[in-house]
Amino acid sequence: MNLAQLIVVGNVSTDPGTRQLPDGRYRTRFRVAATSRTLDASSGRWRDGETTFLAVVAWRGLAELAARLRTGDRVIVVGHLRQYDYARDGGREIGYEVQAQEIAVGLASRRTATRSSHGAAAGTESRA
């Protein structure tokens, strides 16, 4: 197993596809779009850079939770990069995917209900 661990922060770019394998395990696969950002010193504004699309695979219980994600959800994925070979147009290709160990939904860009320290709902907040 390749132990190149990485953290990917981005948006889910395809709805997850989940399937149960013959041995009973669940596997969920989806893609994440991660866009770099740089601060333009002259204008003081953030500018989007290149977008990288990565396949993410989750297994077992994490796969069942990842199946609830939807296109556009902001996620933070921690996992290992895995290289694999596959056949395409009569030849062999190399692909890469992130084998997820943890997946978190980024709440800063999502409408969420928050709770005060007393447990009462404090309202909703939306950030972009």
Spell out what each predicted region is:
Residues 1-128:
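Single-stranded nucleic acid-binding surfaces, predominantly the OB-fold ssDNA-binding core
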